[in-house]
Amino acid sequence: MTEDDAIDVLICGAGAAGLTLAIDLARRGVSFRLIEKMDDPFRGSRGKGIQPRTLEVFEDLGIVDKIAASGGYYPHQREYRGDGSMRDVALVEACEPVPSEPYGVPLLVPQFLTERAMRERLAELGHAPEFGCALVAFEQDGQGVTARLANGGEEQTIRASYLIGTDGGRSFVRQALAVGFPGKTLGVRAIVADVTLTGLSRDVWHRFNEGSMETQISFCPLTEKGSFQMQGPVPLEGDIDLSAEGLTALTAERTGRTDILIQSVSWASAFNMNARLADSYRVGRVFLAGDAAHTHPPTGGQGLNTSVQDAYNLGWKLAAVLSGAPETLLDSYEEERRPVAASMLGLATRLLEDMKRGEIRRGREVRQLDIGYLGSSLSLEDPQRQARIVAGNRAPDALLKGAAGQPARLFDLFKGPHWTLLEFEVETVGLQPRKGLHIQSIGQGGDLIDNKNQFRDTYEVASGDRILVRPDGYVGAIVSQGDVAALEAYLHDVGLKTGAAARR
């Protein structure tokens, strides 16, 4: 093993979580390798719901437009009843974008297209996943992780400061750490398949026998080459014929129709639904993220989105510690993300029970815009402050005007791997500039003008308030005019030191 074999981060698993982390580390200049034991990229549509909060993450990572162009909005669902009647219903509550929430509803994007867009973005940043490369062993000490990789019959030993397991529900990393994965199998087995077919239109999501766990079956039109995602519960025991002929027979049995013919199957899977949560997200210098840390039933479209946001939370913290921030900053990853996963597990399981009763409509609860880290060790807040937006909340967008008269958005200010300090009508000299912190003054004579009072009304700020927004778009701190010392201490604790302090 040579110095060339030493990297900052080894990411094991090139799905949505691993790709998100890789993109974030790449734009921060962190050295890493992203390995994937499979020989080729995942080719199924499985995790197809992209929630509004994840779209905000993708905007920051530079891929939201490509993701949106790869998919579309959820179609209405056409419910076919046993008496031959049918009705069309909305699957998603209508919600128009507003300045504070620019993405109102989820998008339907096949997972393999989402991951393709992520790989393309990673390539723009000069990196690529290493397919066919497996992690076969690792051990750690106080300074890093020694990992043994196997690729095409050849083995290599490398050294990394940190190892991240994003290798799915059957995670090798989690099992090697002996981290428990408690939870339960939910007593539901289902199939999901990407198919082409004849006999159904592409303008609606077709669902037969809604609410029946014995005979329900559905066909959701996808954007890719006229295909559909076919879904349905199946018996807990026994083999399932996932060929075109087998799925055609299953369709005829459940719908009573012989005109729906499955012509081809590009990907198919039969799986048991589980709800499980890792006992720990961190063991020393090894972390778990995505499905390696939590598995959800697919109801509500939470799994992929939660995985992306795990990685988005972890990436900036790894980069900060590698640049000199206190190691304890990494403890906040599990502190913040494990409760979110526990909540999402509960939500997805409740939605599964709703589906069994025939209720499939989804509202704000699945959009992940209200997820926050209130009470986190990284949330600095005056306990007396009463407002809608407090430290730990998602930082909303708002429309402003630049000092030169040009339109401006908060999200454009947040975009990138930096922290953002918003100073509202601050008259006194405040914090010194430093690397990694962008300071924006809002108000007359400032960098930005709150000409429509959107910022003031959304954040409920008073003159002299300072709002610190983290690199992942959450409010880290809100302090008033006289609390600059507390804010300075906070910045020091997350590695944002002034020039002189940073050199010490």
Language-model segment annotations:
Residues 43-123:
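Active-site-adjacent segment of FAD-dependent monooxygenases/related oxidoreductases
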Residues 26-47:
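Glycine-rich FAD pyrophosphate-binding loop
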Residues 131-145:
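A conserved short coil-to-beta-strand element within the FAD-binding core of flavoproteins
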Residues 5-7, 153-162:
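Core beta-strand elements of the Rossmann-like FAD/NAD(P) dinucleotide-binding domain
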Residues 70, 241-306, 340, 344-347:
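FAD/FMN-dependent oxidoreductases across multiple families
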Residues 18-19:
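N-terminal Rossmann-fold NAD(P) dinucleotide-binding loop
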Residues 120, 162, 166-273:
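Conserved FAD-binding catalytic core of PHBH/FMO-like flavoproteins
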